[in-house]
Amino acid sequence: YEFKVSGDDINTTLIDLSSNDYFGLSRDKDVINAAHETTLIEGLGSGSSRFISGSRPIHKSLETNLGKWLNQDSVLLFPSGYQANIAAIQALTDKNSIIIADRLIHNSLLVGSKTSGAKLIRFLHNNLKDLEKKLSKYSIINNSILVVIESIYSMEGSIAPIEKITKLCKKHNCKLLVDEAHALGILGNQGKGLSHPFLDSI
């Protein structure tokens, strides 16, 4: 997004290519006003985790609306994408599982994989041949395999061949986790992310 910079020696408009604020919503007047109005009603924080007493009607409302938008039975909000990734991997694996992950996955996915107790195997970035080689090797000895990828890799912008990866996972009877952090709301039909057309296979 564009933003103005001014000072003693500079007065110009720049384009931000280094942040995750793709649409400049952090400085959008309508968003700021809506946040202000909501703060007057909800306050500045819930006071505790949702597990204790921090679950507010606004959380439930957002989860319900996101679920309808994404055609999902339910959606669960987390304080951050980092925490969501760690929790998702730990929910889908255990010490007897094998995780086969792209070499360029985000650190949160890597931390989740390592703390899950599962065996972690890496495959070459977006390399279907290397992925299938590892799936063929490990699916013979383990029936609890989770493949971990990102739909779009934040560090260098490459897009995963999701359709082909879903077919490989189906062929080898494996689960697939797709991190949509940098695609949801931006890419795909109606901004629903790049994996949305293949949800029945994920």
Q: Residues of each region from the PLM?
A:
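N-terminal "arm"/small-domain region of PLP-dependent enzymes with the aminotransferase-like
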Residues: 1-44, 174
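Conserved active-site segment immediately N-terminal to the catalytic lysine
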Residues: 172-173, 192-202
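Conserved N-terminal alpha-helix of the aminotransferase class I/II PLP-enzyme fold
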Residues: 33, 37-80
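Active-site phosphate-binding strand-loop segment of PLP-dependent enzymes
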Residues: 121, 125-178
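Short, structured coil segments at secondary-structure junctions
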Residues: 95, 115-117, 172
